[in-house]
């Protein structure tokens, strides 16, 4: 009996995980315009090639490769400023040594 309950539980979890239920009712999905330019150019063409599961990930707000690359390029600024600040003390040390050589 316990084995049957475990199998039913695993089956229910698998069906839930692999189901492609939409957040919108089916009637709203049919009324929505479709095609490559339907979302005003917001949905990239690579998403259409990945199938319906990717559409649901898009609805959930998960990012694809173009957005991830853009996010990585945004994150370059802060640590570059920290590195420049870290090299400032090295420059100061070099200038101090040069000043010491000029004064006997």
UniProtKB/Swiss-Prot annotation:
Coiled-coil residue windows: none
Subcellular location: Secreted
GO MF annotation list: hormone activity
Leader sequence segment: 1-21
Region entry Disordered, spans: 22-49
Pfam families cross-referenced by the UniProt entry: Gastrin
Protein name, per record: Gastrin
PROSITE patterns: GASTRIN
Residues bearing the modification Phosphoserine: 96
Family listed: Belongs to the gastrin/cholecystokinin family.
Positions bearing Phenylalanine amide: 92
Residues with PTM Pyrrolidone carboxylic acid: 59, 76
Positions carrying Sulfotyrosine: 87
Gene Ontology CC annotation, any one: extracellular space
Organism: Felis catus
Residue positions assigned to the propeptide: 22-58, 96-104
Function of the molecule: Gastrin stimulates the stomach mucosa to produce and secrete hydrochloric acid and the pancreas to secrete its digestive enzymes. It also stimulates smooth muscle contraction and increases blood circulation and water secretion in the stomach and intestine.
Biological process terms in GO annotation: G protein-coupled receptor signaling pathway; response to food
Primary location: secreted
Keywords on record: Amidation, Cleavage on pair of basic residues, Hormone, Phosphoprotein, Pyrrolidone carboxylic acid, Secreted, Signal, Sulfation
Alphabetical list of InterPro entries matching this protein: GAST, Gastrin/CCK, Gastrin/cholecystokinin_CS
